[in-house]
Structure formats: structure tokens, C-alpha cells
Amino acid sequence: MQIHSFSLKNIGQFQDLSVSLAPAQDYPSNITVFIGNNGSGKTSLLKSVATALTWFVARLKHDKSNGTPIPESVILNTANAAAVEIIVNDQNLQQQIQAYTWRITKNRTARKAEFSTYLSELNQLTDYYKQWLGDDDQSSLPLIAFYPVERSVIDIPLKIREKHQFLQIDGYDNALNNAVDFR
């Protein structure tokens, strides 16, 4: 799975922003770099992508689970609603590259909905991964991690007293939030 692009509507200081990630048709590089002054919105971009990806992780674990909602505090001051849309490319069951799109939205309290949430392609994508894992429990899952500036370490055990077994899906625990636990 590779993020192709994402768009923000009324998030932070961005009223309407679309970002394509490398590699793009005009730029064959494999790296995307965000450069800007303090307060220019780099973290808003990354947090928005992380918020959208929490829905992938949640739906991969349980069919109807919700990811992290868009916080009302990040909605543009002059707007009543916000949306984050993400497009990822991945193989489908026929081993063909396919684009999957999903959109999450947030309305200010007691305000009319401006955008609609769209999750059907996300559900298709997570269903494919569930089927792959069901067929072969050693199937690869996408690597997803987010390390914000304020990420903190909750607990580091000095001695590991027992041997633990982990499922691949457990790797997503705390991968997109601000804390890490080494237990």
C-alpha cells in the first residue's frame, strides 16, 4: 500500500489543499519532503494523514470500527466542517494496482453537514487484507508509523519476565498516536 495523494478541506489554515506524494508523473523520485517555516502547517498535514490512516487500522481489526475522528479544534475558524480524503494504491486480489479512496469528515457541533464521510473503498481494501491474512498468516501488512514531535515513551520495562507472542496486527497498536509503550 502506498499513499498516492491526500486532500484537506478546512483543516488548520488550509481551506482546500491537495497534495500528491512521490513518485508522481512529473517527479519520479521516491521521496516527498515538506519544508516550511514554523506554523506553516507541516504538522497539520502529517496529523491529517495519520488521522485518515487510523481508520484503515481500525477497519482492519474490526469491520465497523472507527478510527480517530478529526478534532473539532482543527477545523478552520471560518468553516463549519472539515474533511480529510486519502487515496492509496495497492494490489487487489487479481494482483493489479488499484486506487482506494476514503474520506472522513467532522462538523462543528450543531452545524449542518457540509461534507460526507466515504468509507466503502476503505472497507474493500481492509477486506482484501483480511482475506490475505486468512489465507496466509505470514502475509505482509503495510508499514504504518507516525512519530510526531511530541511523541512520548510511556513505559520501558527493565526486565522482560515472560515471552510474548504477537500477531502482525498488533504492530499497529499505538503506531499512529503520540505515545509508545514497550511492554
Language-model-derived ranges and their functions:
Residues 1-183:
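P-loop NTPase switch/coupling surface
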